[in-house]
Swiss-Prot record:
GO cellular component: cytosol
Superkingdom assignment: Bacteria
Species annotation: Psychrobacter arcticus (strain DSM 17307 / VKM B-2377 / 273-4)
Entry's family note: Belongs to the PurH family.
Keyword Hydrolase: yes
Catalytic activity, EC: 2.1.2.3, 3.5.4.10
Biological or metabolic pathway of the protein: Purine metabolism; IMP biosynthesis via de novo pathway; 5-formamido-1-(5-phospho-D-ribosyl)imidazole-4-carboxamide from 5-amino-1-(5-phospho-D-ribosyl)imidazole-4-carboxamide (10-formyl THF route): step 1/1; Purine metabolism; IMP biosynthesis via de novo pathway; IMP from 5-formamido-1-(5-phospho-D-ribosyl)imidazole-4-carboxamide: step 1/1
Protein name as it appears in the record: Bifunctional purine biosynthesis protein PurH
SMART domains: AICARFT_IMPCHas, MGS
CDD domains per record: IMPCH (cd01421)
Pfam families in UniProt: AICARFT_IMPCHas (PF01808), MGS (PF02142)
Domain notes: The IMP cyclohydrolase activity resides in the N-terminal region.
GO annotation terms (biological process): 'de novo' IMP biosynthetic process
Annotated catalysed reactions: (6R)-10-formyltetrahydrofolate + 5-amino-1-(5-phospho-beta-D-ribosyl)imidazole-4-carboxamide = 5-formamido-1-(5-phospho-D-ribosyl)imidazole-4-carboxamide + (6S)-5,6,7,8-tetrahydrofolate; IMP + H2O = 5-formamido-1-(5-phospho-D-ribosyl)imidazole-4-carboxamide
Length: 526
């Protein structure tokens, strides 16, 4: 066995491991390895010793026991200058670098046909033990858990076998983050199957989520609040386009409120399968329009509420065209524009407004294919967790409850306004006509007052409510909302239904000759 310092390599993700191993040998390391990693290295003629040959103890129990041996953990945990004598007495050589990533538990449990046995057999034991041992002894040992760190480790080594204390500490923290994430996934998976049948429940006994800080923010919702932006990194699903995956192409750093509002705008525009534009202010849509012509979609959305759109967030569900980008910056002050991608020339056009932040998020999934993520709401001393509201309604789901039948055009507008209402803070009322918003009433304690505000907004923008449709995110508790709609000329209404007074609201709609449909689905948003 070479007296060169040792590096132990045992990885499930074998990306670039051969090149990394070759670099370690060039830096002066001798290599130990196990199982599949050992076989891969030997196939590429990399000089490496199998761990079982080093320990004199064979792998056993179908690979369950490979590295759990004093010669391995003593070599990792031994304190240089303190434990040298006992290491020498037991022929334990120093292991100065540990390169380990863990069994693919996340990928295993993401399979639709995963069994409990599959999951159990993909719970790594030896790997986390080595990772934690090396991270604990980071004063003397380097630990690498991420293939993305291979290059910087080789660059830091140069022609030596010593990493700086700063780098070892950073890698150790990353290693503990790695094992915490791993154990959290295991606890979530097993904790949601504590019933007799071991069938998955919606929520596990304990809730673990790993978040990674991507940005320190200047301040929070208000200047006296400190803040940072974290993103989830323990999702077993492929990450669909979101504010967390978006890339900023231009403009100054995003603020706390920018991120929150951009999320609201992007999630709303995702609800549309046809080309759409959404303008958001203070997390509420203030203008939404669907149009194959992106410039027309923007101008129409803007015209719903020009005052509120000032300094707003604009989201598109199609690539941002040069014409639309130019129309925006020539027309208004905007904080953020986000789209799946941008066409050539867009950044040159928006560069004239250096404070405009331009983000791309990647292709958006069809509304019916969106991943159902979890929503969190912090309460004092706890966390409310629920499934994301991705409930979809089609024309076939509508229950017509009035004598007057809605026309095909009205049904299209009802479904459009229903999509918008889902993203307006409750109590939410949306007036729409011709696949565009006419007025939005948001966040009122009284539903009828939200309806009044929607009408006021429409009048203020010079938009006619006569013949428009109305969407309500929850049922009308009294007929006053219907009477108010009739006063401004609303022709059709969409609402969940389910009130004790549904008969009264249906009667009111019939009195006024208004078509009304029930969805059977509520969309409170707080």
């Amino acid at each position: 066995m070479s007296k060169a310092p040792l590096a132990l390599l045992s990885v499930s993700d074998k990306s670039n491991i051969v090149e990394f191993a070759q670099g370690l040998i060039q830096a002066g390391f001798g290599l130990l390895s196990t199982g599949g990693t050992f076989r891969l290295l030997t196939e590429h003629n990399v000089a490496v010793t199998e761990v079982s040959d080093y320990t004199g103890f064979p792998e056993m129990m179908d690979g369950r026991v490979k590295t759990l041996h004093p010669k391995i953990h003593g070599g990792i945990l031994g304190r240089r200058g303190t434990d040298d004598m006992v290491m020498s007495e037991h022929a334990i050589e120093r292991i100065d670098l540990v390169v380990v990533n863990l069994y693919p538990f996340a990928e295993t449990i993401a399979r639709s046909d995963v069994t409990m046995n599959d999951a159990i057999e993909n719970i790594d034991i030896g790997g986390p033990t080595m990772v934690r041992s090396a991270a604990k002894n980071h004063a003397h040992v380097g630990i690498v858990t991420d293939p993305a760190d291979y290059t910087r480790v080789l660059e830091a080594l140069g022609d030596s076998t010593a990493l700086t204390a700063t780098l070892r500490y950073d890698l150790a923290v990353k290693a503990f983050e790695h094992t915490a994430q791993y154990d959290g996934m295991i606890a979530n998976f097993l904790g949601s199957r504590v019933n007799e049948s071991q069938e998955p429940e919606s929520f596990s006994r304990t809730f673990n989520v790993q978040l990674e800080k991507v940005q320190d923010l200047r301040y929070g919702e208000n200047p006296h609040q400190k803040a940072a932006f974290y993103v989830e990194n323990n999702s077993s699903k492929s990450k669909q386009a979101s504010i967390a995956t978006a890339k900023q192409l231009q403009g100054k750093a995003l603020s706390y409120n920018n991120i929150a509002d951009t999320d609201a705008a992007l999630e709303c525009v995702k609800a549309f399968s046809t080309p759409a534009c959404v303008i958001v202010k203070h997390a509420n849509p203030c203008g939404v329009a669907v149009d194959i012509d992106q410039v027309a979609a923007y101008r129409t959305a803007f015209s719903t509420d020009p005052e509120s759109s000032f300094g707003g967030i604009i989201a598109f569900n199609r690539p941002l065209t040069l014409a639309a980008a130019t129309a925006i910056i020539d027309n208004q002050f905007v904080e953020v524009i986000i789209a799946p991608s941008v066409e050539d020339g867009v950044l040159e056009a928006t560069a004239s407004k250096k404070n405009v932040r331009v983000l791309v998020c990647g292709d958006l999934p069809a509304p019916e294919l969106r991943d159902r993520q979890l929503d969190y709401k912090r309460v004092n001393g706890g966390l409310l967790v629920q499934e994301q509201d991705l409930g979809l309604i089609t024309a076939h789901d509508l229950k017509i409850v009035t004598d007057v039948q809605p026309t095909e055009a009205q049904i299209a507008d009802l479904l459009f306004s229903w999509n918008v209402a889902k993203y307006v803070k409750s109590n939410a009322i949306v007036y729409a006509k011709g696949q565009r918003t006419i007025g939005v009433g948001a966040g009122q304690m009284s539903r009828v007052n939200s309806a009044r505000i929607a009408a006021i907004k429409a009048e203020h923008a010079g938009l006619a409510t006569e013949g428009a449709v109305m969407a309500s995110d929850a049922f009308f508790p009294f007929r006053d909302g219907i009477d108010n709609a009739a006063e401004v000329g609303i022709a059709a209404i969409i609402q969940p239904g389910g009130s004790m007074r549904d008969d009264e609201t249906i009667a009111a709609a019939n009195e006024h000759g208004i078509a009304m449909v029930f969805t059977g689905m509520r969309h409170f948003r707080h």
